[in-house]
Amino acid sequence: MPGVDRERRTIPVPLPEGLPAGPRALLVLEEPASAPAAVAALDPVDGTLRLRVSEPAGGRVSVLVLVPVVDATALWLPGSDRDQSGLPPSWADDLAFSPFAGAPLGSLIGRNDRPVVTFGARAQGGRLRMRAGMVEETAELLVAFTADLSAGGLEVVLDLARDDFGAAVGRVRDAVGLRRPAVAAENHRPVLCTWYSFHQALDQDRLLAQARTAASMGFGTVIIDDGWQTSDNDRGYGSCGDWRVEPSKIADGAALVSELAGLGLRTLFWVGTPFLGYRSAAYAERGLPTLYDEPAMEAAVLDPRSRRVRGHLVERLTALLRDTGAAGLKIDFLERFGVDDPAASPEDCGGESVVRAALALLDDLHASASAVRPEPMIEFREPYWSPETLRRTTMMRVADCPLSPVRNRVGIVDLRLATAGVAVHSDPIMWAAADTPERVAQHLHSSLFGVPQVSIALDGQSPEQSATLRTWMRFWTEHRDVLLHGRLRVVGIASDYAAVEAARDDVVITAQYAPVISDAPAHASTWIVVNAHEQEILLRSAAPRPARYSIVDCTGTTVDEGEQVLDGLTAFAVPAGGVLRLTFRER
């Protein structure tokens, strides 16, 4: 079989009746002396195909699934850094997944953005590898999942329904554990982040001045990013590990948090959790066990298997919340814990793996923090979204992508589709000082379907830039229930989502990120279309739909209004960064 070592033993897995013609599944044995137990069955609730593999004796096993490729156009794999535009070969490199390195989830996309097959998997041990690509000899999609069964079983989930893309992804997402209980409302409030606007050069007076402006714009949270814990501005991580507020940057952490709270703003502090900086007191005095050094970062990575390490971090971070009154933490760099276990273990190790110990650290921290701050707000970011980490966070942010609206958009939509219950946040939005209001709007459009984080010097913007930010903050706040909790529909998956639509009750909001034709919703009373490109807006209606319309530019200024019957194709001259609002009259 193409893509399979001919020395490996392969065993066909019988599939249940009632499936579309064509799919087949096999086990590829790498290490087990005996064949693992494999059961395939259709789930009676969601109709997905579940393949469960177990082997008490352990060993590495691969589950291979082959599906005929008909009308395939692209392979969707969630992640802001993924290329969604093509079809990789079956011999492409494996992708490695762990609790701190994403989740194996994907969909083969056919014409009109319809799924051919949607797939995912979960290994009880948390680690597995996935390979997905086209078999050129047979015109099939090969999806292979490999896991070590000594850590527990492996379950593969397939959805063969060629219906709605978002619905298919949702069924597989839920089956592999990527849904958590809905988080509290404060996690969905817009965020002013200090990173791109200050970097480490924090200034308390300037921060407070900008916070006052942010509060007037509708922001609800301030993230005090890297820099609060160090007296220098050198961008390294040599000061990490003590996690005490540096008085030269913030004279009184509790007073600052209290003043921000008086403005209606919650405060989160950034922490580079794994790092033990070479210049920290903890590095010099405590002799904490480490996994490895990162000289370029001026730090070592702590070994979470050590009870002393976990105790140190829990004590320091809980004290930070208790002493300042902060609402939570932005926990960064957790992917540093996603490593294979070193040969040597610290003396106070309980026998768990590095990954399991890191998860235990997060649990200990949550329990301790909750005692001083009920329901703490916790931010994680790509790539550490997984079934294991999702329930340990309340906010999931797109990976760093400064000045990249496309990556922000793709990351937000991917996380919205691939997870449920958590608040999905943009990477902090920034723009150049000379950017036009239309360009500023383009950056803000990128975060429409997630919670916007902004990191820009609010006191350094032109009147037009400020007006654009205020307009879009007002728009997002007014429509956040639809944007965040409406049913998502995407167009142009292989084109980084040419259009995205959210619908809730009788309101539909469509953002066109490229010149496309958007179809009028059949039952909505209000249709809002955002022009996130440079051309006119084209709409299509299968039947005459009389409507009242208004058009505003990116600063919120009305440029046109009137009445129009949508019938067939209709063009509207909406300025770049502007909004078309249609209110349909009863027919």
Residue ranges and their predicted role:
Residues M1-L178, H523-T526, L538-I551, T555-G556, ...:
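N-terminal accessory beta-strand-rich subdomains and adjacent acidic, glycine-rich linkers
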Residues F165-R179, T221-D226, S248-E298, E375-F380, ...:
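Glycine-rich, aromatic-flanked loop segments that form ligand/cofactor-binding clefts
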Residues R189, Y196-Q200, R266-D323, D414-L415:
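Active-site-adjacent "subsite" loops/lids of carbohydrate-active enzymes
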Residues H199, M217, D226, L260, ...:
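Active-site and adjacent substrate-binding regions of carbohydrate-active enzymes
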Residues H199-Q204, V245-I250, P274-G277, W385-E388, ...:
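Acidic-and-aromatic substrate-binding clefts and catalytic sites of carbohydrate-active enzymes
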Residues R206-S231, D323, A327:
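Catalytic domains of carbohydrate-active enzymes, especially glycoside hydrolases
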Residues W228-G253, S280-P304, E335-L359, L365:
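Aromatic- and acidic-residue-enriched carbohydrate-binding clefts of CAZyme catalytic domains
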Residues L361-G577, T583-R585:
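Active-site-proximal substrate-binding groove within the catalytic cores of carbohydrate-active enzymes
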